[in-house]
């Protein structure tokens, strides 16, 4: 007789198994992901196999009841939550700006993959007709948003360019819902053979118009109403922080419920609801520092893949009665990995603006994971076929026996889908592809941070302190490049500039603003000069004001005369990028461009004519001033350069959201051209700023790794290790202090009251409750920081 306190149920064992796995894996998750390059989905599936009915039989969902029905609803909830989260985390108005790239991946690429998989299933599996093969292909065509998180978020994502992360994230969130037309067209072809009119009527009227189009409209309505409701509640201060963070989860469940009740595509409902909910970027800004969604996603992923690993039909993988053999499934898996997406993406690469190189096209084509979406599509398809055979509630807990109508299609559907998922989890669940891509990309992170130079607190003696301090007194000086007489090396540009630093509050930025209307070509230079500090970035940065041996070495820049070699700053590639970028921007005179051979274009200009919400040509009485201030604060971070990376002969500069700010390509003959994405409605070419070209040269792995900087009198000199002068700047202080007059400028663009656009994420989030004076404080000088990700 067992002690009655030890009456263990199946649910208790399931809780314990999930808890033990989640606890152990969480403790070693960083090691497994970064050292072993294995994702949590693979480890969870293996654990589910071990504790499942095929091994230890501790965790057996097959004994819980109708397994297909349980799996269908779990998959539905997980997908709706993940799809909604993906659409919320996209940059604001992403679908409007990148609709062509997303459409090319959703329509021609998915159609190609669907037909290719169907063809090989029809060839490899004996007894299946072509409509049944089309159904198999439709279930495993879409990419999975859950498995895609391994490349679009987390540590691995830092090795992938932001525009690729956004593209993969958007595609994975949208194409699960767009798999419905392929699935139901295959079902109609299977159920109504030879009845073309019935097929067309059912597919167009029911699937396309009702399930997809009406479902998308329903999602937009839910998202729009949710956005207005939460903004009203937050404005009235009647919602607490916890409910505010959980609101998007509530909306995702609402989409799943209404979508299922109305018989529409609930995944499309969730995606478009999330897109409409986060359309203006307000919610994403408010919850930027919160990790609630990530925590929930991790817990759901752990539990789901343990569950999935325990219910995989291992016996059916080698079941000759239904026409399946292991070798057939292995060949089919190779076809799925290599022919499902890669050929179509490579072929359409010139038509996809967000794919900038063949390597990126190869990566986008390769990374098409199959996971939860395929499970959902397979069980839903099986349920639809079973509903035409029986009056019982579907999906059934068993597969109809041999001899019943469409029995082989229903019997093969689940094993083929599961084997494809296993292959995808092994191939895409690891991050080797991401690591290999990052190995070829030379990335430089650009951030800005305020530093203070006071006699009482600053003990550092950096050579950059040889520049006059940018104090609040507004003491002016000019910085002039003197290396104009040196012959440019191949791939180098010759720029002769001079400039003047004025008062921080209404100095250089005001002068730039005034010249903006007379010289439109300098707009990108102005935007690139505002490098925004990102406080949540936890990676190390290099401070040019730091004179330790780890950064710039020892120096005595104040010593007049020729600097001794021991007093010279020895800089690596990263520090040289930082120095050249910062000093060239200081020395840049917008009225004296003498740039040859380089031409770039602004790929996306925030607030351009097609973005009518963010243009400032409006009546001041029509829009509240707080709303205009909020819009301005949203636009500013999007115009700040965050990361630059080079690949082959091109350099790409992105903001923190992954939107491409500048994209330049250099050819061997010295002539460079620029390419713009399709979302830019006109190519406005301009002369490239020197830092853009310098980033391409210095981040090149073939360039020299050591540079020397020293001061001779009023000259700052930068040399490479061979002794060739790389840059020379002359500092010309101007006596006296300038008196600054504040005057009102009739400019439709609200005037910034500070030279530095430094503000925290919390200030951006609460922009409607704070005035402009609170958002921008007095600025000290601006120090550039650079983090090199190339190594």
Swiss-Prot record:
The chain crosses the membrane at residues 12-32, 36-56, 70-90, 105-125, 128-148, 173-193, 203-223, 244-264, 267-287, 294-314, 319-339, 361-381, 418-438. Residues 750-762 have a biased composition (Basic and acidic residues). It is a multi-pass membrane protein. Residues 670-694, 729-791 are annotated as: Disordered. GO terms for molecular function: potassium ion transmembrane transporter activity; sodium:proton antiporter activity. Glycans are attached at residues 291, 545, 572, 754. Its main location: membrane. Pfam families: Na_H_Exchanger, Nha1_C. It comes from the Eukaryota. Residues 729-745 have a biased composition (Basic residues). This is Na(+)/H(+) antiporter 1. It comes from Zygosaccharomyces rouxii. The gene is SOD2.
